């Protein structure tokens, strides 16, 4: 961005947070240059025609997924209406903070309906839609809009009046076009770099999972003689390993919560940690249990917790003492089971697939239960070998995680650079007229 110079002459915008703007730029409220949530009365006679349908989860930054179709009459009431070239922007948390905004294009019959949590902005002759699209990604606009959100928890929304009355600055249409052309080029370049880094990060994560799965089911000695485990999900194991029922290694802890137990959160991302710590790490509040507290289950450090309703992420290791919902099964390791080894095994792709297979024939609406866990046999190296494998994985996983963290940091920096360039361009801090 250093190659771009400022405009030759600036003036005071009269808006404190905007400050100085190019002398020939104008100040306008968003509602002066656009229509917010346009009326759909013109569609009354075409209600039998098809249109695109857009759930909230299919709106992302600069992307909408157009794979759902409805008849207009089925979605006419109760959904947001939009057309090709309209700006679609999420108004609810966390979608707004995640910059879920795009311009509609390629809609069936040029028409779409979607979630009411999407605001639709249709520019008029005073503004080019892509210029306003970039303006709505400007950092200070987003900061102010987030600070004005109303509601509680996960239902906080940007008020409509923020979109209508917010003051922006803009040049004439020809200059807007020039700015947008350069923004399109530069953001596409940055997005391509981000895409490459994300693919590299996914490869690292795949390598991490493959390493874990191989180590916990095949060991670390590539020359060891193998045998058939007799268990489909495990396959071959070293000849000296055992394969035993889960109950030989783990027992269900049925202890009720203690009076002084802290509430724990069983998460795929962090394991089983205090609820307060989870809220701190995620920087958000989550619902706290207030009913049936006497039915909660006690958890000790290094116990395992299995969600009967959501087991796709495997079984989580307890990293603190406390209590969890009665909807969980709590497992205590017996003598001869190295907790860290089984922590890796229980999060491996093969074991998770085994749980899914075990639960495949469970009638819809029922949960996985302890009996289903018991069905899965487990590999059993010696305790010494379990410890050796877990120490090896601790080192290798930490190394891969450090690489992933570096890639994530570089992606965050690229995203910051993208936002900074957009902000500088749409507020007139840099002059893009010379290309």
Residue ranges and their predicted role:
Residues 10-13, 111-119, 150-177, 308-309, ...:
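A short glycine-rich beta-alpha junction/loop motif
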Residues 9-43, 165, 173, 177, ...:
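Non-catalytic DNA-recognition/assembly elements of restriction-modification systems
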Residues 122-128, 333-338:
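Ligand-binding loop in jelly-roll beta-barrel domains
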Residues 52-68, 87-114, 130-134, 143-148, ...:
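Short, ligand-facing micro-motifs at secondary-structure edges
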Residues 11-14, 31-43, 52-87, 247-259, ...:
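Sequence-specific dsDNA recognition surfaces
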Residues 132, 176-179, 342, 346, ...:
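Interdomain signal-transducing alpha-helices
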Residues 1-18, 24, 170-224, 380-435:
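Amphipathic alpha-helical coiled-coil/heptad-repeat segments
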